[in-house]
Design a protein with these regions (language model features):
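Short, charge/polar-rich alpha-helical segments
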Residues: 1-18, 47-49
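Long amphipathic alpha-helical coiled-coil segments
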Residues: 32-41, 57-75
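Basic/polar low-complexity intrinsically disordered segments
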Residues: 2-7, 52, 66-75
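Short E/K-rich amphipathic alpha-helical oligomerization segments
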Residues: 17-48
Length: 75
């Protein structure tokens, strides 16, 4: 695997982490003093989005780490 491919995997990973961070901040912003059903439902939806973004970041990390292990340790 060439450095260009590793750079791409690193970029994909870092982008996924940035989306995860944005989703965390969005969820945090929705934890407001507004205790209405609408506000709680929006907060719950943001939590689902955060969970999905976390999964994407973890998958991208695994792909990048696996590629690094293959290059560095031949497995």
């Amino acid at each position: 695997m060439e450095d260009l491919q590793l750079d791409h995997l690193r970029f994909v990973y870092k982008s996924a982490v940035e989306r995860w961070i944005a989703a965390i901040r969005e969820e945090e912003d929705l934890a407001t003093p507004d205790h209405s059903m609408v506000a709680v439902e929006a907060w719950d939806q943001a939590a689902f989005k955060e969970e999905a973004a976390r999964g994407d970041a973890k998958a991208a990390r695994k792909e990048y780490a696996d590629a690094l292990r293959k290059v560095l340790y031949n497995f």
